[in-house]
C-alpha cells in the first residue's frame, strides 16, 4: 500500500518550511505576551478525553496491559489536567503550545483528522481584561504571519443559555435549536417557534437571534429586543471587553455574533471565532471555560484559544502571501586534497546563516548549479 488514510497528509520540504515558519511566528507572539510553552503527551488514557469528546471521534487503542488509550483530540483538556494535578500554585498562569491533535471527523477542505494547533491558555482569572487579552493575542498572532482581511466574531455562551432558560426548553429542544443557530437557519427557527407555541417578545427575539451579528450596534439591538436583567448582564460584559479592545486599537477586527454556539461543550462564557475573507471556515476558535478544570478536581477559571496552522497556511496561500525568508545557498566544489579547507569554509559560511553544500569535483558533476546563489571553487 502506497496511499495514505483519509484525513492525513505529507508535507514536502517547501510546504513544511512554510508550516514551520508559521508555527515559529505564532510561538514568538505567545512568548512575547508572557506565555510559557508546554508539551503534553500525544496520547493518554481515553477516559481523560471521553468526558468531553464523543468516543466515536477519538482514535482509541489498547496498550499491552489492556488499558484504553487515545490520541489527543484537544490540548486544552490536557492542560486542564496538568494544571489541576501538577501546577497548583500562583495564578494567573500563562501557557502556550504548538501541537498535533487527532480527531476522527469527516475529512474535508481545511478539516483533517491530524492537524496542528497553536494556542494559549490563561488560567486563574475571570474578568474582562483576561478575555480581551486572549482575543488580542489571537489578532496579533494572525497579523504576525501576514494574514489580512480577517474578522473575529465574538459571542457569549451565557447568551444562548439564558435564552433557553427563559423559554423553559427541554434538552432535546435545546440541542435542536442549537443546531439551527449553528446553521443560521432562520426558516427552521421560525418553524420551531410556531411548533413550540412561543409568542410575543420572546418569539420576535428568537426569530432575530440568527441575524444578531455585526458591529457594536448589535449589542444595542439585542437590549431593545429582549431586555431582561440576565441578558443585560451578558451584553454589558461584552461591551466592557469591546471597550478594552478599542483601547488596544483593535476595533476594526471585531464583530459580534450573539447567535453563536460552539461545538465543544466546555465553554462557559465569552466565545469567539476568526474568519478570513474568502474562506468559509474558522481558522481560530476560543473562549472561556471556567468549568473544565473542575473535571480534574480544581475549580479554577480559564480562557484560551487555538489557531489551526494548516488553515492559516491555506489563508496565506489564498492571499498569495509568502512569509519564507529566502536563504542564500552556496555550493562549494573542491579537490579531494582540499576537503579539510572546504569544510572549514563551509562552517564559516553556515555561521553567517547561509545554506552550504559541498561536493568533490567528481560528485559535483551531478549537482544542479542553477539552484545555488553562489558557487565557490576550491582548486588550490
Curated annotation (Swiss-Prot):
Pathway where it operates: Amino-acid biosynthesis; L-histidine biosynthesis; L-histidine from 5-phospho-alpha-D-ribose 1-diphosphate: step 1/9
Pfam family, one: tRNA-synt_His
GO molecular function: catalytic activity, acting on a protein; histidine-tRNA ligase activity; transferase activity
Any one GO biological process: histidyl-tRNA aminoacylation
Keyword flag Amino-acid biosynthesis: yes
SUPFAM superfamilies found in the cross-reference section: Class II aaRS and biotin synthetases
Origin superkingdom: Bacteria
Record has Phosphoprotein as a keyword: no
CDD domains: HisRS-like_core
Location (main, coarse): cytoplasm
GO cellular component: cytoplasm
PROSITE patterns assigned: AA_TRNA_LIGASE_II (PS50862)
Similarity remark: Belongs to the class-II aminoacyl-tRNA synthetase family. HisZ subfamily.
Note in the entry: This function is generally fulfilled by the C-terminal part of HisG, which is missing in some bacteria such as this one.
Its biological purpose: Required for the first step of histidine biosynthesis. May allow the feedback regulation of ATP phosphoribosyltransferase activity by histidine.
Name the UniProt record assigns to this protein: ATP phosphoribosyltransferase regulatory subunit
